[in-house]
Amino acid sequence: MEQIMASTVLPMRFSMLLRTIDPIKFLWSGALFLGVLSIFILITKLPVHILRIFYPPVSVFVHVGLFIVYIVSASYQAGSDKSDPKHLQSGPPWYITKSCSVASNKDNIGYCQQAKALFGFTIIIIVLYFVEIIVSVHSCFVTKEEKAERDELREEKRTMKEYEDMVLRTPRTFPMMSPALPSGGTTQMMPTMSSRSPEFSTFGHGSSDLPLRDHFSTPNPRPPAQQESSETLAPGNQPQMYFPPPPKKAAKV
């Protein structure tokens, strides 16, 4: 008996609760909830797109859910206005089908414009999510060209990974060359110079291109290279030139 009474009382209380809910407040609360939900999803989609984990099936599921929710919101906004029992209106409300200037109270013109803007924004969002659903469904099917491009990128990454591992295992003996490209060509790079290479060991110990530095820095100065070449190539005995030349004696008058 108690179970039968409970089964009849609970639906009655639930129906009374639905009657006490103001449809206008419920509609505006739902619109506010949709706005917050949309902003949250937009903020979440940015890092997910950057990380490339927003896969097409997930995108289809998310956008279909948002599409359905906004369809329900638009149907409530364009539904019958029965908030005032004395002025029941079947069909879309007047603030959507008529101009806001027909309002008897001029203070309601601003609210009418807000309702129109909200309804138009809802329709735009529905169209946007419908387009995103189509794009997401199309992305679920990979073409042969896209599959070949993805395989080529994976092969290139695998080759680069193997080359890096080989360089890390043998850093001294392995030449600094770029890995083989998928097309078969290679790119030669300049060899590096370390503290154990011959070029580094002879750095600073060889002859300089400055003749005066080699001439005066050694114990036995030698003439510059240009002077030696001129002496060997010129015929006959020529007086030896010094640098700088000695001063000439002034002639007596």
From Swiss-Prot:
Region (Disordered): 174-253
Main location per the UniProt record: membrane
GO CC annotations, alphabetized: membrane
Subcellular location, record wording: Membrane
Free-text disruption phenotype from the record: Causes the inhibition in mycelium growth and induces conidia formation, corresponding with reduced expression of brlA and abaA. Results in elevated production of kojic acid, via increased expression of kojA, kojR and kojT.
Recorded topology in the membrane: Multi-pass membrane protein
Transmembrane segments: 23-43, 53-73, 117-137
Pro residues bias (residue ranges): 242-253
Induction conditions: Expression is increased during growth and development.
Compositional bias segments (type: Polar residues): 184-200, 226-240
Keywords recorded for this protein, A-Z: Membrane, Transmembrane, Transmembrane helix
Biological function: Involved in mycelium growth and repression of conidia formation by affecting the expression of brlA and abaA. Acts as a negative regulation factor for kojic acid production through affecting the expression of kojA, kojR and kojT.
Record's protein name: Kojic acid related protein 1
Classification of source organism: Eukaryota, Fungi, Dikarya, Ascomycota, Pezizomycotina
